[in-house]
Amino acid sequence: MRLIGMLDSPYVRRVAISLDLLGIAFGHESVSVFSGVKQFSAINPVVKAPTLVCDDGGVLMESSLILQFVEARSGRSLWSSDPAQLQHEFRAVGLALAACEKAAQIVYERQLRPTAAQYEPWVERITGQMLAALKALEYEVGLRPAVFADPGKQAAITSAVVWSFTQAMLGAQLGAADYPSLAALAQRLEQTAPFLKYPSAGPGVPGLGAGQ
């Protein structure tokens, strides 16, 4: 299998880390949806990251669907089997992905759209949504540490990946002191082998590639 997309995208990164934890062999190709449009479109004309090229040549998109597929294929899961615990994990990942989506929209608005064309009421709205999601996620991490204790579970993985992304792109707006539980979670997971193997920044991880 081939995973296409830049690791500065939290969606690509969560898939890469998850594939590694599931023990699934794959090749990662750092192709940007911005500077590498021609190369990306030759693989997937939709030019959406992450893209997973399956062993039979089939092409999948959307990080959550990709992860659902690879878990079904491998017979392993990064989710709890207990429904009560799973409910909390789903809430955490839902909040993290909501924060991620709004953070990416803010970045696109500020970095890609000409200043004169930026619509402040829209920026205020999505900023409020991002902050609400992060506040709720911070509460969950502090209230239910057991849900995030295992670095091999999706709740911890996605929450940490998203926090690192928001800090890298919008750190001036998001003081770590306001999210101590979330910041501590990310700091802990960023020191684990899968996170170090697939960093969000560094050689070969330039630019802006936050495609879902």
Regions found by a protein language model. Give the residues of each.
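Long hydrophobic alpha-helical segments typical of transmembrane helices together
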Residues: 176-212
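Non-transmembrane alpha-helical segments in soluble domains
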Residues: 67, 71, 90-93, 134, ...
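Aromatic-glycine hotspot motif
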Residues: 52, 64, 130-138, 194
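Short polybasic/polar patches that bind polyanions
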Residues: 20, 168, 191
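GST-like fold's C-terminal all-alpha helical module
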Residues: 96-187
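GST-like domain detector, emphasizing the conserved glutathione-binding G-site
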Residues: 1-120
